[in-house]
Amino acid sequence: MPRPAYRSRSVRRIKVRTPGGRTAVHYEKRAKGAPRCPITGLAIGGMNKKIYRFGVSNRAPTRPYGGVFSHKALARAIRLAVRK
């Protein structure tokens, strides 16, 4: 039986053929996707998904709600706020 940490479905299972001829199971973390806007579902522009060693403040755009909402959702929210 695998270790308790490997019983979770949050880790990928990869079957690997060993030099001895048997098949072993290797576990690895699932790849993270690009950050997405919670309103429109679009990928957030300006956010690099490969630079996870930096904090969000260093890799997010400097516009209001940068790194949280997409440009379309932000433009819609600004228009609604100005109209009120």
Swiss-Prot record:
Pfam families for the chain: Ribosomal_L34e
GO cellular component: ribonucleoprotein complex; ribosome
Protein name: Large ribosomal subunit protein eL34
GO terms, molecular function: structural constituent of ribosome
GO biological process: translation
Gene from which this protein is expressed: rpl34e
Organism: Pyrobaculum neutrophilum (strain DSM 2338 / JCM 9278 / NBRC 100436 / V24Sta)
Alphabetized PROSITE patterns for the sequence: RIBOSOMAL_L34E
Family: Belongs to the eukaryotic ribosomal protein eL34 family.
Membrane-spanning intervals of the chain: none
Alphabetical UniProt keywords: Ribonucleoprotein, Ribosomal protein
